[in-house]
Amino acid sequence: MNKVIVTGGNHHNTYGVIRALADKKIKPFLLLVNEDSNSFLLKSILLEDSYVVKTEQDAISFLIKNCYEFNGAVVIACSDGMSSALDSSRNVLDDFYKLPGTKEQGRVTTLMDKETMSQLGVEVGFNVPKSWLIRSVNDIDCVEYPCITKPILSKDGHKDDISICHCRKDLEKVIKEGSCYEYQVQRFITKDFEYQLIGLSLNEGEIVIIPGFSRCIRPCPRTNTGFLHYESLNRISAPIEKCKSFVRKTEYSGLFSIEFLRDNKGVDYFMEMNFRNDGNAICVTSSGTNLPYIWYLANSTLGYKEELSHSTFHSVYVMPEFPDFESFVYTGKISIIKWIKDIIRTDTFMVFNLKDIKPFIFCVKRLLKRFYRKFLVRTN
């Protein structure tokens, strides 16, 4: 039986994959990329074992060093950084591990470039917002406002690099103070809502599985993670076939998500594709289709078709309880009564899990300590 290595950061994205595999009685090995070992993930009873490294390159070194011990292991990437690192080391790792990505080393990292993705999106017929590639303030004369800035490579940027700019002065500030050497600046679209198509590609896009779509009800700032409703594809007019064509053109195999924004006129705009497990993907598992497990089966001798044929679908509400509380309840943007009502209708939380309660308790303690420190600062 093949082992499974789940690798990524200290995030509910990684935990979602661990939980999905646990539903099928598989305990994965966690290769955690984190500055220290103070992680809620390490409190989980759903792991076979774990190892903590500080950087993605350290993770690659670990995989190379332990390639015979883990020979044949199925790898699942849960961050842009790890997806790119695996891609950049494919020629070294491919003989020992079942990797997500493409057969060509470096191709996924090239595809992560937002301008490259936009061009590919145009080729398959997506609506793509007008954009500009910006390296310095000398490049911004042609930009139209309002606009939104994004790191050209998500793995290289921070949340603060994503900003809505209403004038030249705003844009200059982001470029001068931001952490990126290069930005994609897009025309800002007034949205009605945003949605994701979370899926799995097998055999370089020969088979593309997209069970439903996630509609974000209350997005947390600077991220597409938020209180969401996962629904049937019958409830939205989405460019599914174009998405499958897009994935085939990338020649990618593995877990993915494709993000869209629908404007106030009903037009859908392609935002980007994530070449990894998505942070919201627990909604797909909760709805009845276990994509991480199907990826595991497709890369083992067990076969995946029976599992796929037995998959069901029901709509679910999913909440990232800690970011949602901090972003909306703690700041007073929504009332505690409203939040409790949303909790009551939530089917799945991104950390709270009765089968594995210690990670949740750890996060509660960490949140209370942070609030206490803020209280001390205010009173002093």
What residue ranges belong to the model's regions?
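ATP-dependent carboxylate/phosphate-activation module, predominantly the ATP-grasp catalytic core
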Residues: 169, 187-251, 274-299
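Active-site nucleotide/adenylate-binding loops and adjacent lid/helix of ATP-dependent enzymes
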Residues: 108-184, 189-190, 203-206, 237-238
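Peripheral (often C-terminal) accessory segments that flank ATP-dependent C-N-forming ligase machineries
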Residues: 297-380
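Short glycine-enriched loops at secondary-structure junctions
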Residues: 32-37, 80-82, 203-208, 213-216, ...
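A short glycine-rich, hydrophobically flanked beta-strand micro-motif that places a catalytic Asp/Glu
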Residues: 253-265
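ATP-binding N-terminal substructure of ATP-dependent carboxylate-amine bond-forming enzymes
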Residues: 1-103, 369-379
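Protein kinase-like catalytic core scaffold
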Residues: 147, 208, 269-272
